[in-house]
């Protein structure tokens, strides 16, 4: 890690859902669209095929041992929160692998962040009755696919202190953030229009000039059998994302 660089990107890759091309192309997209010197670290259980410019951390060593004692059905992707406990100066960001960056993000990542800054699902939250089921716990309008912060140690500490009851209560990281911290105004959000959703925005599968990045997360769509035509990045051949995504091999 080059500590002279005050901008640090992180991404996670474990299991077999996404290959190394996802890591390599995400790095390539940031290299193209970020004019600030940065470190890029992949936290992974398999570094095979990852380009040499990418720094590596062992996924099986990230975070406290007692966090790993819980199954992945408890606050799924909670590993991301361990990044708030890292002793690194400057601005930190995590970016999910299924996030296609296609616009300049230099201004975004150069901001001062008083609060950890997440994506708000604008494509869902304005729908009629979007907040109707808040008390039931079935909705979720916080998205953790592109997150920036400078000092958010409190979020790791709160989670660690209350780990047992939080693991009992929440199945996913985004729901934990939405129901536990969004309502207490401890989170900030990117402005509407910066992030788009390929499968959920209306009309779907459309390129939007104002967006800096587009999300392709499909797991919840398919698990819940929502009847939406949904594509992962590697399934978009013949559609507009494909040429952009594959260009980052260069």
Feature locations, PLM:
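Short, surface-exposed amphipathic charged segments that create phosphate/polyanion-binding patches used
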Residues: 55, 70-76, 130-137, 204-210
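Short, charged, surface-exposed secondary-structure boundary motifs
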Residues: 19-22, 64-72, 125-132, 232
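Active-site-proximal specificity loops/subdomain of glycosyltransferases
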Residues: 43-88
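Short beta-strand-to-loop element that shapes/binds the nucleotide-sugar donor at the catalytic cleft/hinge
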Residues: 117-143
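A glycosyltransferase accessory/donor-loop signature
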Residues: 1-25, 36, 42, 50-59, ...
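A conserved catalytic-core signature of glycosyltransferases
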Residues: 79, 96, 142-144, 172
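GT-A fold catalytic core of metal-dependent nucleotide-sugar glycosyltransferases
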Residues: 56, 76-127
